[in-house]
């Protein structure tokens, strides 16, 4: 039962039932994505297997990384920060970020990171 005025029902989705694709940071399972926009979602969530990630940034979106497995290093504006299972990382818009090592993370983007909101330092071209 929905409370009157709500837009869509709650959602449960399992990683094994979610599409998987290659991203800038590694392989990701699309747990919640822009395809769910009609549900009124304000964010997306992906389970990502990071094996090193090229430094990049977003002008409009904030990201949260929660480390599920592994150990590595997250680079934020040139400063290296060790991360391990249980670490959480907040990445505001404009912060150049990347990673070293092999970690599995839950990445939440707020709002959804659009294709035209992925930039690489020194590049003048938008990348997807």
Region roles according to the model:
Residues 2-23:
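Extreme N-terminal tail/first-helix region
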Residues 2-6, 38-41, 100-128:
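Double-stranded beta-helix
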Residues 17-55, 61, 108, 112, ...:
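A short glycine-rich, His/Asp/Glu-containing loop-to-beta-strand
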Residues 52, 60-72, 77:
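Glycine- and acidic-residue-biased ligand/ion/polar-headgroup-sensing regions
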Residues 55-56, 74-75, 91, 95-102, ...:
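Short beta-strand His + acidic residue motifs that chelate non-heme Fe in jelly-roll/DSBH
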Residues 78-94:
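Short acidic-glycine-tyrosine-enriched beta hairpin
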């Amino acid at each position: 039962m929905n409370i009157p005025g709500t837009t869509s029902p709650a959602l449960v989705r399992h990683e094994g039932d979610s599409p998987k694709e290659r991203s800038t940071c590694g392989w990701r399972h699309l747990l919640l994505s822009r395809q769910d926009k009609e549900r009124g979602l304000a964010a997306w969530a992906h389970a990502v297997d990071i094996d090193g990630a090229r430094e990049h940034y977003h002008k409009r979106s904030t990201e949260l990384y929660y480390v599920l497995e592994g150990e590595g290093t997250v680079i934020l504006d040139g400063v290296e920060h060790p991360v391990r299972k249980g670490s959480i990382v907040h990445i505001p818009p404009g912060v150049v970020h990347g990673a070293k090592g092999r970690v599995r993370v839950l990445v939440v983007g707020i709002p959804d990171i659009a294709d035209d909101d992925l930039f690489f330092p020194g590049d003048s071209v938008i990348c997807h």
